[in-house]
Amino acid sequence: MRGEGIRARKALGQNFLVDRHVLARIADIVDMRPDDRILEVGPGKGALTEMLAHRCARLVAVELDTRLVPVLRQAFRDNPRVEIVHGDILEIDLRDLLAYEGGERWKVAANLPYNISTPVLFAFLDNRDLFSRLVLMLQKEVGDRLAASPGTKDYGILSVFFQLHFDVTREMIVRPGSFHPVPKVDSAVLSFVPLEKPRVAVGDEQYFRRLVKGAFSMRRKTLWNCLKNAGLGLSGEQLSEALAVCGIEPGRRGETLSLDEFAALSRAMMALGGK
């Protein structure tokens, strides 16, 4: 077995996916074509890499664990389509890593460690123009938040930000027994297809993000109270006016607002001088 004797490191959030049926299903969800370019994050011992490598034109796998890099390079030494990159995905410039491939968009396959999933998600979000499809395995709780609808307990910042720019699909649940060592929680595989343009116009996206973060900053508080203290450049009176223009009751909670309502509110607040 490849990498036999190398134990998962808790500090790296490692849980190696060992279920061949789940691995095959993930490879199918990636939906590869012979000319596709694949970025794999966290290949581990290379089980998924092996299934992907013979179905695409090129595969770049980024692995942080210094013990696994030589194992992976040895395993794929005879496959010129595979490149193993030693590094931290959070510190690598994705544009530098992938841009030399002639501008073609990449597909992503990743089993994200639970402890870094959110910052990696935002790295993908902010570089979304590089990708045509992402297939990510995440802690189920994070997956639920990404795909949540307004008014549900899981709906929040991740839901709004990602649904603005991606079609997000829950693909499958992966039980703990599919991993070694066995984690304490379920995982979920989700696919993300970047939209050609945002689902709705938000005006200045940085302002929109600050607004959304403010709206979810105190879930027990009303929307008006959350936004009043969010540093968005409006007085309480102006905030009330913006909410009225959008037909949004100031006593609502942030988690009840749809993406369209957040976008309309962002535009209205900026029109009144929000900054």
UniProtKB/Swiss-Prot annotation:
The lineage of its organism: Bacteria, Pseudomonadati, Thermodesulfobacteriota, Desulfuromonadia, Geobacterales. This is Ribosomal RNA small subunit methyltransferase A. It comes from Geobacter metallireducens (strain ATCC 53774 / DSM 7210 / GS-15). The keyword Protein transport does not apply. S-adenosyl-L-methionine binds at residues 15, 17, 42, 63, 88, 111. Its main location: cytoplasm. It is found in: Cytoplasm. Keywords: Cytoplasm, Methyltransferase, RNA-binding, rRNA processing, S-adenosyl-L-methionine, Transferase. Its EC number is 2.1.1.182. Belongs to the class I-like SAM-binding methyltransferase superfamily. rRNA adenine N(6)-methyltransferase family. RsmA subfamily. It catalyses: adenosine(1518)/adenosine(1519) in 16S rRNA + 4 S-adenosyl-L-methionine = N(6)-dimethyladenosine(1518)/N(6)-dimethyladenosine(1519) in 16S rRNA + 4 S-adenosyl-L-homocysteine + 4 H(+). One of its GO terms (molecular function) is 16S rRNA (adenine(1518)-N(6)/adenine(1519)-N(6))-dimethyltransferase activity. PANTHER family: DIMETHYLADENOSINE TRANSFERASE, DIMETHYLADENOSINE TRANSFERASE-RELATED. InterPro entries: KsgA/Erm, rRNA_Ade_diMease-like_C, rRNA_Ade_Mease_Trfase_CS, rRNA_Ade_methylase_Trfase_N, rRNA_adenine_dimethylase, SAM-dependent_MTases_sf. NCBIfam families: ksgA. The keyword Transferase applies. Specifically dimethylates two adjacent adenosines (A1518 and A1519) in the loop of a conserved hairpin near the 3'-end of 16S rRNA in the 30S particle. May play a critical role in biogenesis of 30S subunits. GO terms for cellular component: cytosol. It holds the Pfam family RrnaAD.
